[in-house]
Amino acid sequence: MKLEFHHINYVSKDVDALHKFYVDILKMDDIAPQNFPRTDATDKTGYAGHIKFATEGSMQMHLAEQDFDVAARNGRHINPVERGHIAFRTNDIEAFKAHLSANGIEYADYGTAFAAEWHQIFFYDPEGNIIEVHQQVV
């Protein structure tokens, strides 16, 4: 099972202003949102918040509109767009879930509720920081 760093997610009440800061001040490149196909959110599943993306070439930043109700709306116990998170990509999400379970770490499996091409799970580190691990499913 391979694991590699993928992105940092920051949440904001003003995604456009945050994105402008990273692009204009830190000179990061914009990543077009069509590179990240999303699922359609409903009143019971998914996430319809505003998202923008930036990169310095190797690492991505996902800048998302803060939403305190995502976990409840999706029937999960971890909310990845309340405070933000760091993310890793794996080539075997099922093996990684088994690894977490074997170590007594609970996780929230969002499947493809947020991103049409990623199976995402979220869990907490010992300090309460949210970590995402996803596998590309296309």
What residue spans do the PLM features occupy?
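Vicinal oxygen chelate
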Residues: 1, 5-13, 49-57, 73-138
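Short glycine-aromatic motifs
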Residues: 2-3, 28
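Core segments of cupin and vicinal oxygen chelate
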Residues: 11-59
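Hydrophobic side chains in well-ordered alpha-helices
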Residues: 18-21, 96-100
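A short, acidic/glycine-rich surface segment
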Residues: 37-42, 69-74, 109
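A short acidic-to-branched-hydrophobic micro-motif
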Residues: 61-65
